[in-house]
């Protein structure tokens, strides 16, 4: 399974929903908390073109945010991406 990285903040309901989906699927992920860390927000802007959270990567693939992750799941494409 490729590494999964998710940038989050503690108060973000979309971050919680994205993490819950990954946890339900038994996915280990690295969570990078951006709370009060402008340098991480700047890193997000460089990597994702956005500073909104969550931002999720599966391996080298930038998935996007919570809605994007759930759309992959609904389309039946998330498992394939996780097992690549």
UniProtKB/Swiss-Prot annotation:
UniProt cross-references to Gene3D superfamilies, sorted A to Z: Glutaredoxin
Cellular compartment(s): Cytoplasm
MF (Gene Ontology): glutathione disulfide oxidoreductase activity
Domain annotation Glutaredoxin: ranges: 1-84
Alphabetically ordered keywords of this record: Cytoplasm, Disulfide bond, Electron transport, Redox-active center, Transport
One BP annotation, GO: cellular response to oxidative stress
Keyword Transport: yes
CC terms in the record's Gene Ontology section: cytoplasm
Superkingdom of this protein's organism: Bacteria
Record CDD domains: GRX_GRXb_1_3_like
InterPro entries for the chain: GLR_AS, Glutaredoxin, Glutaredoxin_subgr, GRX_bact, Thioredoxin-like_sf
PROSITE patterns for this protein: GLUTAREDOXIN_1, GLUTAREDOXIN_2
Residue pairs linked by disulfide bridges in the UniProt entry: 12-15
Primary role: Has a glutathione-disulfide oxidoreductase activity in the presence of NADPH and glutathione reductase. Reduces low molecular weight disulfides and proteins.
Family the entry assigns: Belongs to the glutaredoxin family.
NCBIfam families: GRX_bact (TIGR02181)
Summary of subunit composition and partner proteins: Monomer.
Protein name: Glutaredoxin
Organism, as annotated: Pseudomonas aeruginosa (strain ATCC 15692 / DSM 22644 / CIP 104116 / JCM 14847 / LMG 12228 / 1C / PRS 101 / PAO1)
Gene (name only): grx
């Amino acid at each position: 399974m490729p590494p999964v990285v998710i940038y989050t903040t503690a108060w973000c309901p979309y971050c919680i929903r994205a993490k819950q989906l990954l946890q339900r699927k038994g996915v280990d992920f690295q969570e990078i908390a951006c709370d009060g860390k402008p340098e991480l927000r700047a890193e997000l802007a460089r990597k994702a073109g956005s500073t909104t959270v969550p931002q999720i990567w599966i391996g080298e693939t930038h998935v996007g945010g919570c809605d994007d992750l759930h759309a992959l799941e609904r389309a039946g494409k998330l498992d394939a991406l996780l097992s690549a």
